[in-house]
UniProtKB/Swiss-Prot annotation:
Residues 1-35 are annotated as: Disordered. The gene is rpsI. SUPFAM superfamilies: Ribosomal protein S5 domain 2-like. The lineage of its organism: Bacteria, Pseudomonadati, Pseudomonadota, Alphaproteobacteria, Hyphomicrobiales. GO terms for molecular function: RNA binding; structural constituent of ribosome. Belongs to the universal ribosomal protein uS9 family. This is Small ribosomal subunit protein uS9. It comes from the Bacteria. HAMAP family: Ribosomal_uS9_B. The keyword ATP-binding does not apply. Residues 1-10 have a biased composition (Polar residues).
Length: 158
């Protein structure tokens, strides 16, 4: 019996001495920018961030011009606010496909990933907020024999 206890004690000692996961490294290009792609519905955003004054440019236009609705601008700012980095990074994004809501979600996803490339320590905060998770919901396809994906044609008894 004492032999098993001794081996179990050794096992617990081994578990406590296990090495930690390797630290994530900063991924930055030659110009000092972090790059990431974000996706949402049909939209794909390519996002570059670099230290700056907090200016956000989408498709060569200011964010206030491109996303006129305040809700969409707030959506894009969420990962920066969650990481408490307002006014510290300039964001340049090119986004294509989908509508404005999907594009805003794609830019948000790209900003979140780029922030983790620039500051790997922010990964926990952004992951907890759900900003790093790709929203996989897409439009359901239309089926034959139906008016839309699920809606049937109008039915008449007589």
């Amino acid at each position: 019996m004492s032999d098993t206890m001794q081996s179990l004690d050794q096992l617990s000692a081994l578990k406590t001495a296990a090495p930690d996961a390797p630290k994530r490294e900063k991924k930055v290009d030659k110009q000092g920018r972090a790059y990431a792609t974000g996706k949402r519905k049909d939209a794909v955003a390519r996002v570059w961030i670099k230290p700056g004054s907090g200016k956000i440019v989408v498709n060569t236009r200011d964010v206030e011009v491109y996303f006129a609705r305040p809700v969409l601008r707030m959506l894009i700012q969420q990962p920066i606010v969650a990481a408490a980095r307002q006014g510290q990074y300039d964001v340049v994004a090119t986004v294509a496909g989908g509508g404005l809501s999907g594009q805003a979600g794609a830019v948000r996803h790209g900003i979140s990933k780029a922030l983790t490339h620039f500051e790997p320590d922010l990964r926990g905060v952004l992951k907890k907020g759900g900003f790093l998770t790709r929203d996989s919901r897409v439009v359901e396809r239309k089926k034959y024999g139906k008016a839309k994906a699920r809606r049937s044609f109008q039915f008449s008894k007589r």
